[in-house]
Amino acid sequence: NYFMEMDAAAYKDRYESDDVGPGEPFINRPYKKLRPTFEEQFGWERQRSIKSWIYKSFYDQKTSIHWKLFLFLFNLTPTKQMDMGGHKFMFIYIKLLFNSSISSYKDFIYNLTIDPSMLNYLNLQLSRKETPDENYAREVQELFTVGKRPFSKFTEEDVRGVARALVGWEFDYEAIVYSEGHESVVNFRPWNHDTEDKIFSSFYKNKVIKGKEGDAGAQELNEVIEMIFETEEACVY
């Protein structure tokens, strides 16, 4: 009844207002390269500005599907807000969520995997080919894509396989934090990549991701994402 009683002007104001993405100018001032102060390095005032903007947007949102999906992703794929990258890592992450809210979820998971905040939060940044960290490999399956439903039968070997395939991605802290601008700088380090084959369970149709050397190793991330999203459970989830 409430919506039936709305006049055209109220409807237009509620449903057709443009969404506003994260602003950019305040973030462009570079830090001092040599011995920055704690405030300069982490930009608390800018971090507060981003947090204030995003939470006010949550509180004041109308019924925009864009903001509803943004809030969904914000809760589904959290990172640590006050991490080592300060306001720049936070800004890059928030902008990724905003731009991904009404686009391909598969593309979002790819970009989320190499987001600096996520690399730091779920330990891919510190993962090594001799001791691959399984934290993100587990969460990307259990929480972000196929879930823990009865038919999501990925195995511990699958977790280890994904972890091995993703070893080698690292953000460039110096380039992000101490440079002007707000762009993500993430590189693939071939010397830290597991070049052996990764063999997966029947849940993934016994997929084999061939180990690759050099820069070609970066392609294994694409193969992992494709493998996960080819499952029926990813669609159901």
What residues fall within each predicted segment?
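Active-site substrate-binding loop specific to GH73 endo-beta-N-acetylglucosaminidase modules
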Residues: F3-M4, A10-P36, I50-I54, G86-Y237
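Short helix-loop boundary/capping segments at the starts of domains
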Residues: N75-D83, M118
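Hydrophobic alpha-helical hairpins/lids featuring a short glycine-rich hinge
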Residues: Q47-S52, S57-L73
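Short, solvent-exposed loop/edge-beta patches enriched in aromatic
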Residues: Y59-L69, P78, N99-Y105
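Residue-level detector of alpha-helical secondary structure
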Residues: N1-Y2, F72
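Cytochrome P450
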Residues: E40-W44, Q61-I65, M82-G85
